[in-house]
């Protein structure tokens, strides 16, 4: 399936399944597929064009791509990030990453999630409300991280060439802005 053939959220999931693997480009433009070794040291966010040409992305890029594809077919949606909070002084480059990005879309008076980056949950999930969706999705990642509390933050863009630390700071800064409202 090509991007031009996408007409529905199921088409987006099918496109992702056919064309995008879990992986990332590093600061040296080397591909890492299916592993997170040296992620904190070498990761950088990829552009949508890089994701499409290399056929790889972690949750950050995959969610951004699905977000753009949903907008392309005129379906309102939002991107969110759940993570164990790390302040900007966190410098353990060997620590595990505890972040997951997800996209929710809104049709027929319901809220839906397209999950592709988490290979254990690939699919489309339905929820009655945005609050229910965020809570249930976040609960999955709280359990996966051993019960640690995880803030959830809506985000609006994926800047190119951000390191993991840069992206985490971007999300933290969005939290600070929302607290000031």
Where are these regions (language model features)?
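Active-site nucleophilic cysteine motif
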Residues: 12, 16, 55-70
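Extracytoplasmic/periplasmic, Sec-exported soluble proteins
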Residues: 4, 8, 51-62, 95, ...
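Charge-rich, solvent-exposed alpha-helical interaction surfaces
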Residues: 15, 133-136, 140, 166, ...
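Hydrophobic/aromatic-rich core segments of domains that either
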Residues: 61-141
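C-terminal helix-cap and adjacent tail motif
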Residues: 124-132, 141-151, 156-163
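Secondary-structure boundary elements
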Residues: 1-54
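Non-Sec secretion/translocation targeting segments of pathogen effectors
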Residues: 179-181
């Amino acid at each position: 399936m090509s991007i031009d053939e996408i007409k529905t959220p199921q088409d987006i999931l099918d496109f992702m399944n056919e064309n995008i693997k879990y992986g990332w480009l590093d600061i040296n433009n080397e591909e890492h597929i299916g592993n997170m070794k040296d992620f904190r040291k070498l990761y950088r966010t990829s552009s949508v064009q890089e994701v499409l040409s290399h056929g790889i992305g972690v949750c950050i890029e995959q969610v951004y791509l699905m977000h753009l594809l949903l907008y392309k077919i005129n379906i309102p949606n939002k991107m969110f990030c759940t993570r164990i909070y790390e302040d900007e002084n966190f410098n353990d480059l060997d620590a595990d990453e505890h972040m997951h990005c997800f996209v929710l879309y809104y049709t027929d008076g319901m809220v839906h999630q397209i999950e592709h980056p988490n290979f254990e949950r690939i699919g489309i999930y339905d929820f009655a409300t945005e609050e229910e969706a965020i809570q249930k999705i976040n609960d999955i990642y709280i359990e996966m991280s051993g019960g640690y509390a995880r803030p959830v933050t809506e985000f609006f863009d994926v800047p190119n060439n951000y390191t993991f630390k840069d992206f985490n700071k971007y999300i933290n800064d969005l939290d600070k802005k929302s607290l000031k409202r």
